[in-house]
Each structure stands twice: as C-alpha cells, then as structure tokens.
C-alpha cells in the first residue's frame, strides 16, 4: 500500500545515463536495446513488482504472472511482431513456457555489463527541474508482499537514482503519472491514412494505441 505523501528518504545516490522503469517485455526491450546501442552509457532498470530470490526475472504478467503474450496468429499472412519481440517469439513460439521466457528476457538484459537491475523496487519520491520541465532523480524503495494481507508494502532498502534519460516502460505508466508528464501515450509514427482527420498533423489529438482486455469466463456449457 503506497502512501500519497512522500518523505525525504534518499538512501545511496547512484548516477546513470538512462533509467528505465518497468519489468515487462517492453522494459526488457528498452533495456537491451539501450545497452547494445549505447555501450558507454550506464543503465538502471527498476522492476516495480515484488520478487523473491528465486523469481528475480523480467516479463511481469507475461512470465511471472503466467500469461502468454504471444498467443497470436498470422493476420493477413503477415507476422505482427518485429524487433526484440520477433527475436523472443523465435525463441519460444506462440505457446512459450513462462519460466523459460522469464529466463530468456533476463539473460538478454543482464548479459550487458552496463546494466544494473533493481529487482522489487518502486518509486518512493522524485525530483524535477524546469526549463525544460524534466525528471532529474527518482528515489526507489524496496517492496514486498505481505503474506497475511496480500498487499504490496514498503520494505527496507532505498536508493536515489539520478539520470539524464528516463523511460517509463511499465505496465501502468506510474512514473509518467507521478511526474505529471504532458506527453502522448499513443504512436506518433502511425501512417496518417490510418488516423482520423482530427489526429493528423503536428497539432492533432494524441493517438492512443489499441488496448485489449482479457476476461475469464466460467460456467460455459
């Protein structure tokens, strides 16, 4: 249970060039790509879900949560995934083993010496600067699941991470929401012929990517 008012608990100060918030496939893709393309950069990855010593892995819902993300088919004869996701698909197929995929994602990120991962930490406070408005630091604190209540609670262990580039690659966009970032969550590079008229041009409305939900249906005969 996260408090609404943040105290000034700082902990050890650590410096990085790129700080990535999230632990899912998208975070693993951002971290591995940044590490491979910016070899001189120090990269920190904050995984904001509680983990045990035996479950320190990337993938979030798509691995530790037991949900298969690649249960797809070839629409119109064209495979939908590219880039890092295409590589991971080639390693596991449509019906991958979630434990195996978790190990694959984690290996593909942690094989780079310029990446440090903070497993089971979440944002406790943050600092910004003006002109232009930007994030400068995040203070992260260890989290753990209360075995009695099931709630995620603050634990012990705090770091303050200072960086130049911050990437919100989380499942819920918590970093973006906390700092009140005024950007778009859509895909700016979509072809204009796929957009509504009011979404076109530099002053067009923000373009929201398609989101899908999964439901569990019971008692169907």
Where is each model-derived feature located?
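Short, Lys/Arg-enriched N-terminal segments with co-localized hydrophobic residues
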Residues: 1-14
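Stable alpha-helical elements in mature extracytoplasmic
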Residues: 26-27, 101, 105, 171-175
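Glycine-rich loop(s) and the adjacent beta-strand/alpha-helix scaffold that form part
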Residues: 165-221
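Core beta-strand elements of the Rossmann-like FAD/NAD(P) dinucleotide-binding domain
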Residues: 153-165
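Gly/Ala-rich phosphate-binding loop of Rossmann-like dinucleotide-binding domains
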Residues: 31, 35-36
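Conserved N-terminal/central alpha/beta ligand/cofactor-binding core
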Residues: 9, 39-42, 46-134, 209-210
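Beta1/beta-strand and adjacent pyrophosphate-binding region of the FAD-binding site
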Residues: 13-26
């Amino acid at each position: 249970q996260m408090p609404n008012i943040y105290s000034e608990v700082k902990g050890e100060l650590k410096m990085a060039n790129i700080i990535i918030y999230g632990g899912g496939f998208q975070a693993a893709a951002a971290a591995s790509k940044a590490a491979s393309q910016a070899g001189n950069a120090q990269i920190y990855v904050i995984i904001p879900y509680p983990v045990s010593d035996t479950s320190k892995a990337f993938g979030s819902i798509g691995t530790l949560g037991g949900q298969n993300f690649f249960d797809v088919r070839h629409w119109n004869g064209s495979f939908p995934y590219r880039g890092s996701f295409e590589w991971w698909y080639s390693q596991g197929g449509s019906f991958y083993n979630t434990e195996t995929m978790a190990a694959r994602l984690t290996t593909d990120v942690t094989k780079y010496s310029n990446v440090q991962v903070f497993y089971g930490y979440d944002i406790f406070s943050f600092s910004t600067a003006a002109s232009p408005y930007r994030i400068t630091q995040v203070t992260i604190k260890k989290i753990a699941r209360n075995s009695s209540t099931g709630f995620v609670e603050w634990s012990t262990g705090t770091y303050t991470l200072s960086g130049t580039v911050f990437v919100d690659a989380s499942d819920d966009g918590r970093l973006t929401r906390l700092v009140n970032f005024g950007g778009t969550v859509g895909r700016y590079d979509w072809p204009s012929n796929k957009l509504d008229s009011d979404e076109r041009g530099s002053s067009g409305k923000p373009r929201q990517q398609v989101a899908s939900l999964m439901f569990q249906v019971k008692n169907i005969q």
